[in-house]
Amino acid sequence: MENSMKKKKSFKESEDEELRRGPWTLEEDTLLTNYILHNGEGRWNHVAKCAGLKRTGKSCRLRWLNYLKPDIRRGNLTPQEQLLILELHSKWGNRWSKIAQYLPGRTDNEIKNYWRTRVQKQARQLNIESNSDKFFDAVRSFWVPRLIEKMEQNSSTTTTYCCPQNNNNNSLLLPSQSHDSLSMQKDIDYSGFSNIDGSSSTSTCMSHLTTVPHFMDQSNTNIIDGSMCFHEGNVQEFGGYVPGMEDYMVNSDISMECHVADGYSAYEDVTQDPMWNVDDIWQFRE
């Protein structure tokens, strides 16, 4: 019995020594891609062996999901995606794979990196817990309005966001959480924009949106004809004026672009992020 155990241990150690470590080669990428395209995903240890790769199953899984899978989206997370991550994390915590299911083309690793290098680090800079009510207040008061403003800038020049009302009055604007609809769209579909009341102020109704309660303060919303509307006063420009904070100015010489790309830096100073770069967030510090 003891000899048998020793042989198994020796065989396993020999296998481990043969496994490749370090960066993947083009040849390995090609082998893995061709195998999965012909046979599909499966048990990753089996995939590694059948594809002729001297890699662990875990290494193959991460390589495929994070780099080789054809439908992976590259580049910066959009404001819509950032808003959705904030909302879903408030519901599910660090369940990155589950959150990734609602962001087509984004990987759980990318979402986790965004949370750790942007959100958690900002909470640490404020000296508060990232899952605390105080931090959610900061998110609701400063980050969410700027994300909504960025969404507005990316779509068209509008002054009011609206979405169909459901049972929750306290909510963020979020893409519909229907798996079918989300899997079909790369970004939120804005084709359903229309005016609400026909007045001179422009209103924008986002199609394929739902409401999920958490961040948005009800006092900042109005219900018009069964719709949830977020008005111009609640959506401030980056580097601009924040209602009730007249004594504080945003540092305007910071770039307005929010770079949330593949190359996250653990040493990046997120206080320079225009989403947060407002002097009046001092009130949220401990």
Curated annotation (Swiss-Prot):
InterPro entries: EOBI/EOBII-like_plant, Homeodomain-like_sf, Myb_dom, SANT/Myb. It comes from Arabidopsis thaliana. The keyword Repeat applies. SMART domains: SANT. The gene is MYB62. Transcription repressor of phosphate (Pi) starvation-induced genes. Negatively regulates Pi starvation responses via the repression of gibberellic acid (GA) biosynthesis and signaling. Modulates root architecture, phosphatase activity, and Pi uptake and accumulation. Residues 44-68, 96-119 bind DNA. This is Transcription factor MYB62. GO terms for biological process: cellular response to phosphate starvation; gibberellic acid mediated signaling pathway; gibberellin biosynthetic process; negative regulation of DNA-templated transcription; negative regulation of gibberellin biosynthetic process; phosphate ion homeostasis; root morphogenesis. It comes from the Eukaryota. PROSITE patterns: HTH_MYB. The lineage of its organism: Eukaryota, Viridiplantae, Streptophyta, Embryophyta, Tracheophyta. Keywords: DNA-binding, Gibberellin signaling pathway, Nucleus, Repeat, Repressor, Transcription, Transcription regulation.
